[in-house]
């Protein structure tokens, strides 16, 4: 924020006669820094995703393809979502009913599943810390 105001003050200085170049340079520099940080964050999350995706077949009950796919989705929810994936989104993803999703979720050990409730809606994600512990033994 200070850089923003400094650049703005520089542009408003009488000797600069309203030249907006310093402001534009500062703004482009902020965009550049933000893009690099975003790239690094996405690359880091993608590396983690690939790591956990390769563990999917080794997770409990993953011998059933639907449960392995559920793990796959719950890993994405853990890495790329604040709240997780909603019950409705899971129903849509699997093209099944509420009770079918509940059945699939019950196949995942409770200690591996994080359930968040927001405005009376359930959101799910995989507890990646617990997965790490499971495979570190």
Model-based region annotation:
Residues 1-41:
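Phosphate/pyrophosphate-binding active-site loops
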Residues 115-137:
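Short, cationic-aromatic polyanion-contact patches
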Residues 95-109:
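Short amphipathic alpha-helical interaction segments
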Residues 111-113:
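Glycine-centered, phosphate/nucleic-acid-interacting loop/turn motifs that mediate DNA/RNA or nucleotide
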Residues 11, 77-80:
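Basic, amphipathic alpha-helical hairpins
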Residues 3, 18-22, 26, 65, ...:
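Generic recognition of stable, solvent-exposed alpha-helical segments in well-folded globular domains
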Residues 42-73:
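Short alpha-helical segments that sit at the start of domains
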Residues 71, 80-93:
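Short acidic, hydrophobic short linear motifs in intrinsically disordered regions
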């Amino acid at each position: 924020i200070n850089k923003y105001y400094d650049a703005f003050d520089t542009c408003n200085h009488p000797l600069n006669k309203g030249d907006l170049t310093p402001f534009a340079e500062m703004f482009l520099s902020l965009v550049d820094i933000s893009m690099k940080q975003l790239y690094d964050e996405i690359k880091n999350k993608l590396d983690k995703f690939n790591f956990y995706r390769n563990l999917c077949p080794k997770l409990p009950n993953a011998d059933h393809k639907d449960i392995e796919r559920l793990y796959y989705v719950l890993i994405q929810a853990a890495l790329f979502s604040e709240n997780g994936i909603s019950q409705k989104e899971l129903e849509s993803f699997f093209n099944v009913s509420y009770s079918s999703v509940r059945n699939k979720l019950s196949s995942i050990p409770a200690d591996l599943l994080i359930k968040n409730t927001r405005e009376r809606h359930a959101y799910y994600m995989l507890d990646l810390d617990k997965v790490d512990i499971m495979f570190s033994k």
